[in-house]
A protein has these predicted regions:
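Extracytoplasmic thiol/disulfide redox context detector
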Residues: 2-98, 190, 194, 227-228
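Cysteine-centric redox/oxidoreductase cores and disulfide-bonded domains
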Residues: 92-200, 205-209, 214-218, 225-228
């Protein structure tokens, strides 16, 4: 073998060695969303040592506050590192909750956490409609077929506009609001929370163990740390 060929062969061998020794790119757990058989959404590493489940209501101010305060530390310090898998389930307190829950679940699974966040971020805007609603409005929300009631709520609360800003067409929204199977899956999550014995929102469990009396990120975070 000539010196030139020997050098080329050694260079290729060295390149192959370096390539095989290079560390694998870290998994972007913040982009990893899975859906359980029950229809709830999980963000992060499904094999994380800690599984946090939050039961929330979209009309609940404390839930919106939890989402706001916990968002950065939960995602960056725990979910992104693959240490915590974050699951969201629904507790329905009224027809408005049910409508928003169907909208957050609308579309591909990857859209859920973005939809979930925007309805909490804008809760102060749309919740005013509930406080100032008229008797005739409330009648529209509770009479007629299921889809018609949800469409009335979506119209009165300007949810169509919120979803359009998220890239949805009105026909997409109406299809999700008419999805009875989705409504049943969401209602089953509420039934599960009642069976567990949760009495307020937000409520939490860690690795399947209910955290009764824990309602805030300040109370929750030390308990997450204790499992890591």
């Amino acid at each position: 073998m000539t010196p030139r060929r020997l050098f080329a062969a050694l260079s290729l061998a060295l390149f192959a060695l370096l390539a095989s020794a290079a560390p694998a790119a870290p998994t972007n757990w913040l982009a990893n969303v899975t859906v359980t058989p029950e229809g709830s959404h999980i963000l992060g590493n499904p094999k994380a040592p800690v599984k946090l489940t939050a039961w929330v209501s979209y009309t609940c101010p404390h839930c919106a506050e939890f989402d706001k305060v916990s968002d950065a530390p939960l995602r960056l310090a725990y979910v992104a590192q693959g240490k915590v898998a974050y699951e969201v389930k629904h507790i329905l307190r009224d027809p408005v909750d049910a409508t928003v829950a169907q909208l957050t679940n609308c579309g591909p699974k990857e859209r859920f956490f973005g939809n979930h966040a925007v309805f909490f971020r804008r809760q102060d805007e749309w919740i005013k409609t509930l406080a100032g609603s008229t008797e005739s409005q409330r009648a529209r929300w509770s009479t007629g077929d299921y889809a018609a009631r949800r469409r009335a709520i979506a119209s009165d609360f300007h949810f169509y506009e919120i979803m359009e800003q998220r890239g949805y067409r009105r026909t997409d929204v109406d299809r999700c609001l008419a999805d009875n199977a989705l409504a049943e899956r969401i209602a089953a999550q509420t039934a599960e929370a009642v069976k567990i014995g949760f009495e307020g929102t937000p409520s939490f469990s860690l690795n399947g163990a209910p955290l009764f009396g824990t309602y805030s990120w300040q109370q929750l975070q030390p308990q997450i740390r204790g499992l890591l």
